[in-house]
Regions:
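Ferredoxin-type iron-sulfur electron-transfer modules in oxidoreductases and energy-metabolism complexes
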Residues: 2-5, 19-43, 60-89, 140-157, ...
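Conserved phosphate/anionic-ligand binding catalytic regions in large, soluble enzymes, centered on
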Residues: 14, 137, 157-179, 278-290, ...
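Iron-sulfur cluster-binding cysteine motifs and their immediate structural context
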Residues: 52-56, 458-464, 552-571, 582-595
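C-terminal accessory/binding modules appended to enzymatic or scaffolding proteins
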Residues: 348-360, 366, 372, 530-578, ...
């Protein structure tokens, strides 16, 4: 037994910041101080506060160190681990307070979180099955195989109110019930780990931090619907997640928790990985299954739905990583426990990848019904620089932008749809007053155009026509009639596209038109971008009262658009200016501004 455990984040974010070097140095320094028998080092999954990595927590006291560098390790070992003195300069300091905070659970970022899907992330070594078992892992599978009938498992999920965490929010128990009712010689369980939304990394972090939870849930699903084979479709761009899944599958087979006659129950179930190439459309369930089959990842018309004809034309259920991660806890704690969290129609918790113009970025897991204001102002620590909140974008390219007037709306599936957005997989991007909403709509539409598989004409052609109109607007070349044309195209796409990619592609455009129409009008009528983002509508000018005639801006300008002699007020020639902004960045006197 160790007297202290040092947990170091080994997720993708902290690994890219050098956490493996920190672990190596930590083990070396601990050995040098003769503490190898007293202090254990554990590489965990993601803690959540990704912007503060590399992150380290020392237990049993729970001291939370952020932005740790390799050179800090000797001091941490000598002072904290040897002498018991906290290294205060490395403690986390919240933006709303001046005091440094020692325990992680006292930070505003964690106070309002309730971890179910992320319960083991940042807590256990994801590459050690015994640590997972030590936290109650595979208990749910044992209960199911020894005490429950398949229909009992499905009823538990129905009673819990669990809805799919990958987008539409379809009741998980109902999906399983449909698949179980269809007779077939083979059925399949698929896990969608093809997380494609820009800025979303919830599923990746669960796979990196708690892969066995997903394997256990898939085995439970196999028992419930009568399947013996599972597939995890994970993108190849997630090398750490892939590696840990491979380790977890091998360990589960070794322990008899995957394979033949699990728990001597006569139940057989195994899991294989399939690596995706990163196509966004392969997040759509029928396209994902087509890709697993070895064909080009294109959606198929529905019906028939996968519960009847899915993978290899056999009954199939497909859930995403976060959905599966909830299931073992529901089995162990009971459906009433899960249903006690959340709102009337949206039970449990939801993991969000919080990003954008916010002080605390990273993963947050909150009960359904938490307001956007609580996320932004308390968990997220507010907007940097004291700037105003303008909008939040949820649901990735399929979602919409939520304005400040809806900050107090409880977040759940139905409320988000009612205000023109959607839950999606859980991306949550915060925008401040310097964000152009027309440019945001254009950004997501550019993504959709690139990721469209091209199978159906409305999506293939319609998204391109919409993008062309948005480009005209951001360049000041549009007319008011273009807005009517844009809305008409949006409505056509929503009703005639083959799959959800095309059907939801108009959402960012429609939501910004609904709440920020005046910005579109300013671009079209006034030929101005109120946020100062759209390059073609910007005009750089020099304030004669502030200009010192230092010539630094003129020497920086790549287009020789700035004229003026030494110690004389300079001017910008708008005909030659390429609007790169280099002069504004270089000016030391704040004399250059844009309008």
């Amino acid at each position: 037994m160790y007297r202290s455990h040092v947990l170091v984040c080994g997720g993708t974010g902290c690994t890219s910041s050098g956490s493996q070097r920190i672990i190596d140095r930590l083990e070396k320094e601990i050995a040098a101080q003769g503490l190898s028998e007293e202090v254990g080092v554990v590489k965990t999954g993601c803690f959540g506060l990704c912007a503060l990595g590399p992150i380290m927590i020392v237990y049993p006291e729970g001291t939370f160190y952020s932005m740790v560098q390799e050179d800090d390790i000797p001091e941490i070992v000598a002072e904290h681990l040897l002498k018991g003195r906290v290294v205060t300069r490395l403690l986390y300091e919240e933006t709303t307070k001046t005091d440094k905070i020692t325990p992680l659970n006292e930070t505003n970022f964690y106070k309002k979180q309730h971890r179910v899907a992320l319960r083991n992330c940042g807590v256990i070594n994801p590459e050690d099955i015994e640590e997972y078992i030590g936290t109650g892992g595979y208990e749910a599978l044992g209960i199911v195989l020894t005490e429950k009938k398949p229909e009992d498992v499905i009823q538990i999920l129905l009673d819990s109110g669990l809805r799919g965490r990958g987008g539409a929010g379809f009741p998980t128990g109902l999906k399983w019930k449909f698949a179980a009712a269809n007779e077939a010689d083979q059925k399949y369980v698929c896990c969608n780990a093809d997380e494609g939304d820009p800025g979303a990394f919830m599923d990746r972090s669960i796979l990196e931090g708690d892969p066995h939870a997903v394997l256990e849930a898939m085995a439970i699903a196999g028992y419930a619907i009568g399947a013996s084979q599972g597939y995890i479709y994970v993108r190849a761009e997630y090398p750490i997640a892939v590696k840990r899944l491979e380790i977890a599958i091998a360990q589960a087979r070794e322990y008899g928790l995957l394979g033949q006659n699990i728990f001597e129950s006569g139940f057989n179930f195994d899991i294989e990985l399939r690596l995706g190439a990163g196509a966004f459309v392969c997040g759509e369930e029928t396209a994902l299954m087509t890709s697993i089959e070895g064909s080009r990842g294109e959606p198929r018309p529905r019906p028939p739905f996968p519960a009847l004809k899915g993978l290899f034309q056999k009954p199939t259920i497909l859930n995403n990583v976060e959905t599966f991660a909830n299931i073992p806890q529901i089995i162990v704690n009971g459906p009433e426990w899960f249903a006690s969290m959340g709102t009337e129609k949206s039970k449990g918790t939801k993991v969000f990848a919080l990003g954008g113009k916010i002080n605390n970025t990273g993963l947050v897991e909150i009960p359904m019904g938490t307001t956007l204001r609580e996320i932004v102002e308390e968990i997220g620590g507010g907007i940097p620089g004291g700037k105003k909140f303008k909008a939040a974008q949820t649901g990735g390219p399929s979602g919409g932008c939520i304005p400040a007037e809806h900050l107090d709306v409880p977040i759940d599936y139905d409320n988000l749809i009612a205000i023109g957005s959607m839950m999606g997989s859980g991306g949550l991007i915060i925008m401040d007053e310097d964000t152009c909403m027309v440019d945001i709509a254009k950004f997501f539409l550019e993504f959709t155009v690139d990721e469209s598989c091209g199978k159906c004409t409305p999506c293939r052609i319609g998204t391109r026509r919409m993008l062309e109109i948005l480009e005209k607007i951001t360049k000041g070349q549009a007319e008011m009639e273009d807005l009517d044309r844009l809305e008409e195209l949006c409505n056509h796409l929503k009703t005639s596209s083959l799959c959800a990619l095309g059907q939801t592609a108009p959402n960012p455009v429609l939501s910004t038109l609904r709440y920020f129409r005046e910005e579109y009008i300013a671009h079209i009528v006034d030929k101005k971008c109120p946020a100062g983002v759209c390059k073609e509508l910007l005009h750089y000018k020099i304030d004669p009262d502030k200009c010192k005639g230092c010539t630094l801006c003129a020497r920086t300008c790549p287009a020789d658009a700035i004229i003026g002699s030494v110690r004389e007020v300079h001017m910008i020639n708008p005909e030659k200016c390429v609007k790169c902004g280099a002069c504004m960045e270089k000016c030391r006197f704040g004399a250059i501004y844009k309008e």
